[in-house]
Curated annotation (Swiss-Prot):
Name of the protein this chain belongs to: DNA polymerase IV
Family membership: Belongs to the DNA polymerase type-Y family.
GO molecular function: damaged DNA binding; DNA-directed DNA polymerase activity; magnesium ion binding
Subunit structure: Monomer.
EC code(s) of this entry: 2.7.7.7
Reaction catalysed by this enzyme: DNA(n) + a 2'-deoxyribonucleoside 5'-triphosphate = DNA(n+1) + diphosphate
Length: 356
């Protein structure tokens, strides 16, 4: 039986990193996304904050006590969703088999979609490079022959790393790990396992299926498998996304119409290419503008028929942008989004030689 090629991509401190990207004055500073008041909770923490022990789901007062210099910023889910759409568009260039787990992580099945690269490891590295080039953010990747091990691998070299667990490595890699490092085993279950003398993957592997079933019920089969590096769960493709967008943040604020039109031309070309790769037809075009003072506005137009060409996409975007001139203050980000689309049937992909 041929081994699968599964990649798990996990963005590094996603919410906090997006804020630090968009506000350079915050780079290198301990940052928490959430409310800083007495009853607030940390939604996410930058790596600078994590060095002090600040973690997500931690009460804000506890986080502030651990890190007095901690700066709290509000969550910006519209921005996170927009960046997530960019990232998932990058994924779709390499495989249609994508299972998003959240805005900032996903499984990709590359088994039959290695393309000219011939290697899931090379594809994963290319995806990470594309993400950094197009969003300014870093991602970690894990490559393996099943979902469980791919997710473990993506954690192994964080942040901004890549790790591969081959079939030869899998069982012993799992054996050496403490059970509370296993995805799918939460704190309560880990405590229960430790009470039974199960501290590591090797300990878990020593228990037969009957013993595991007696203590863990229906979950026993899953635990029995992962302790041996076995996980047959497929990458489950979610329903089609409802929108597809491209945006760009500029080092120098856009102030002139000429610069803005040139920038929008590039964005429209990128977005149209993404839609064509996915064979999507859309009727609604949305323009996003973020000013230098971080104010943000959107304008949308729904056409009577699907956007037929890159030229019409650009013309629609420009007509939405025209009433916004002059740009005062300048514009630091422009974006276009397509929505209200459906996907045509995709042609079958070529079967490639399977290599890690």
């Amino acid at each position: 039986m041929e081994q699968r090629r599964i990649v798990h991509i996990d963005m590094d401190a996603f919410y906090a990193s997006v804020k630090q990207r968009d506000d350079p004055s915050l780079r290198g500073r301990p940052l928490a996304v959430g409310r800083g008041e007495a009853r607030g909770v940390v939604a996410a923490a930058s790596y600078e904050a994590r060095r002090f022990g600040v973690r997500s789901a931690m009460p804000s007062v506890t986080a502030k006590r651990l890190c007095p210099e901690l700066l709290f910023v509000p969550a910006r889910f519209d921005v996170y969703r927009s960046v997530s759409a960019q990232i998932h568009d990058i994924f779709s260039r390499y495989t249609p088999l994508i299972q998003p787990l959240s805005l900032d992580e996903a499984y990709l099945d590359l088994t039959d979609h290695l393309g000219a690269y011939g290697s899931a490891t090379l594809v994963a590295d290319r995806i990470r490079a594309d993400i950094h080039a197009e969003t300014g953010l870093t991602a970690s990747a894990g490559v393996s022959y099943n979902r469980f091990l791919a997710k473990l691998a993506s954690d192994y070299r964080k942040p901004d790393g890549l790790f591969v667990i081959t079939p030869a490595m899998g069982p012993e890699f799992v054996a050496a790990l403490p059970v509370d490092a296993f995805h799918g085993i939460g704190p309560a279950m880990a405590r229960k396992m430790r009470a039974l003398g199960i501290e590591t993957g090797a300990d878990l592997r020593e228990r037969d299926i009957e013993t595991l079933t007696r203590h863990f019920g229906k979950a026993a089969t899953f635990y029995y498998g992962i302790s041996r590096g076995i996980d047959h769960r497929p990458v489950v493709v979610n329903r089609e996304r409802k929108s597809l967008g491209t945006e760009q943040t500029y080092l120098r604020d856009l102030t002139s119409e000429a610069d803005a039109h040139q920038a929008l031309t590039q964005i429209a070309a990128t977005l149209w290419g993404s839609a064509q790769r996915r064979q999507l037809q859309a009727r609604t075009v949305t323009l996003k503008v973020k000013y230098a003072d971080f104010r943000q506005i959107t304008r949308a137009r729904t056409l009577s028929a699907p956007v037929p060409s890159e030229e019409v996409l650009l013309e629609t975007g420009q007509s939405l942008m025209a009433p916004l001139f002059p740009f005062v203050p300048g514009v630091r980000l422009l974006g276009l989004t397509l929505s209200g689309f459906h996907a045509a049937e995709s042609p079958p992909c070529d079967q490639m030689e399977l290599l890690f």
